[in-house]
């Protein structure tokens, strides 16, 4: 093959041949870390060609390129060509569906670089070249000679180049194809990009070297004795022997010799996410005299994974998966993720009570698994197989032609990663239907590695996450107690299926697209109540927003077609890893400490209990802080060191609490770290709870005034003068159109009007696919019925004046396409002290869809820096996403009152507000609390602009006050997912608020 010309190689079209996955690639093995390496990362010469036929026939002889490119990278980011851009699509293939064939217009990245090899390397052993990740397929040549070919963008490709390399300078050339037959198997929900995006390195190996080794840790039933079993393979084994040593820290605890050996460990320290204890294994390949050929060390964890009595168990304890799906993604570099970012992700996950990650939907960089071993995260390792855009979805996965291709993707993943204790589940891929190939791969996994369960969901209605090719029922987006588009069975229905006793772990749930994650707590209530419901993996970790001109881009922003718009933005964190409010909501529901308040039959509080949900960790670094507050100040507080075993509880006496029955009273509880430990800083809050002991809306006595209250009226306006202020009403619609303070300054830039819509959330918009509109989506229903174009019909405006107040009663109908959708009666009470009390009675036509909100909107003239309110905070919160929020008085910057979702929408709401103070304006709840948001952007602008960075700051500040607001939903983002109890279904509503200048 080395004698073949480049044209000969390219004319074979290996990238379209179903039975060719590589040429000359070495078998996969566990990574070898101690052999001498030379990195080839850095600047490479680079040429871009629009199609393979454009590559010059003499390219191998060319010594210059048009440009340079950083390796690792995606060339669509580094090399900007409008004909070859990042493409974001969820399901739809980016190329016509004609497997195994790809378009003739197939962009090519032509890479080349020079490197030196020493004489010692060539004379004393072997030289291997490894590409850790290249997409989607590539050929390479060294010094003009053909080297090899490989596919599978997410696993290493290693080649022995000893016969091609030479002493001194060597020239490496690589042709990378954007599309290949494997494009049909890599149809994941992500940006489609290409290039050499993981490291490239050279490795020197002696003549005698370790080819591979496998470590298994078998524990007895009592978990007090482990056999650490080693099976190793070496080059030239006849001339070598293997020494095997096991260390606990620096203490040697066992050693043996042989390529198939084992060491017994008494009372082993077990690995788990909570206590990720690692032993050090040392392997030494030597000759008979003891001269060392090859030495490797590997950190190993001793642990046991099993499914027993319908539950997935780790070291004998039933696991509750606090998981998240994670793509390899950074906004600056696409698929390239540095170790620094990996550690940052793990730190954030640990801080927010995550214990598991699904590598969606492909094997990650090897370093990721090492870090998960070290810091403690359970991993579902997933094969790089997804055929979501196929019809039927199993068109390829049920075709035996593609079994070898699929087999390599599963078996090579397992062979590389099998020695990591963090990996507790193998996954056969994602959303590829269910075919005979899956069953073959499942059978292979179970025969090769019986120590781990196998997962496969399937993605189509027929499989529902419960085929014979999975040990775990693993539906997507199943709801707790009702069916959904993706999951005909609810979680509770699954628990009643006759003859079914597998554990259920949601491979994807709680789709966090934009302002989402509503109803998340309902899942966790079910997980804690039902033993076989063992958690799940949220979709997903990070917004896939690529940087373009300094701003975050989503599908279509590069002119990419097809595209699925902002469906790439589903993360709990923004692309820069800044937390969204939903992340803190997830932290709250997943927290490892649960609290229960104890009361007498008469309702008197006398104690609370804290329970430790850790399976293995005693509380050795936690303190309990608890306070009695009235929302404004701390009335009483205490702190103690927590002392609980794993799974234990502790009761805290509260009989001495100073409760007098006259004020708002809240019991705030926090669990904090004492010392810095395993990425968590000292004094870091790991759990919190607030109990409302007494709840009162305090009505401050209205301060009377000697000021005369007067009334002026003409054909268009009604003016009330009170406390030297003017309240001017528009008689055509009954709205407060102007408000002048005692100095004549305008307080309003836009009239106080009623509001029933919101800038649509992604969950309101619905489906991901651009070309398809779902008539059941909330936005389509609201638009279709005319809610965004309501016609205001003033029915009556009645004015009553007394010595102390003016009452203006306004009856209004709101017409949608010729029918009355809503009717309201607004009763304005203006008192002599300048206070405006507004009482609103709302009635809806129940034949119409429920509104998003029932409230008010006004544009204040003020633009203050800070806001103070008494209500739920500090983050935004909504009726179905408020678990993490606390009652209290919050003093925040106005910039903290908005959440900058990349795709703008309704945001920043604060629920259960009793009082709001902004500049001179005081808004008080009367009878019940209200919700509000303050923003420099109107709902109208938020609805119209497609990107946050395109929003234009408006004059003053927009204030929205809601008596009632529907939930945000989040079970999924393509079907209406707001639970019934969070919809505004009633026919009548009433709320009251008071406005006053201070």
From Swiss-Prot:
Q: What is the effect of changing residue 702 to K?
A: In strain: ATCC 7962
What happens on changing residue 919 to G? In strain: ATCC 7962
Enzyme class, UniProt record, top EC level: hydrolase
Cellular component (GO) terms are: beta-galactosidase complex
Q: What Enzyme Commission number(s) apply to this enzyme?
A: 3.2.1.23
UniProt cross-references to SUPFAM superfamilies, sorted A to Z: (Trans)glycosidases (SSF51445), beta-Galactosidase/glucuronidase domain (SSF49303), Galactose mutarotase-like (SSF74650), Galactose-binding domain-like (SSF49785)
Q: Mutating residue 182 to G: what's the consequence? A: In strain: ATCC 7962
Describe what happens upon changing residue 237 to M.
Answer: In strain: ATCC 7962
Q: Active site annotated at which positions?
A: 431, 508
Reactions it catalyzes: Hydrolysis of terminal non-reducing beta-D-galactose residues in beta-D-galactosides
Question: What are the recorded Gene Ontology BP terms?
Answer: lactose catabolic process
Q: Name one GO molecular function term.
A: carbohydrate binding
Q: What keywords were assigned to this record?
A: Glycosidase, Hydrolase
InterPro entries from the xrefs? B-gal_small/dom_5 (IPR004199), Bact_Beta-galactosidase (IPR050347), Beta-gal/glucu_dom_sf (IPR036156), Gal_mutarotase_sf_dom (IPR011013), Galactose-bd-like_sf (IPR008979), GH-type_carb-bd (IPR014718), Glyco_hydro_2 (IPR006101), Glyco_hydro_2_AS (IPR023232)
- Result of altering residue 796 to N: In strain: ATCC 7962
Q: Which family does it belong to?
A: Belongs to the glycosyl hydrolase 2 family.
Q: What is this protein called?
A: Beta-galactosidase
The record lists the organism as: Lactococcus lactis subsp. lactis (strain IL1403)
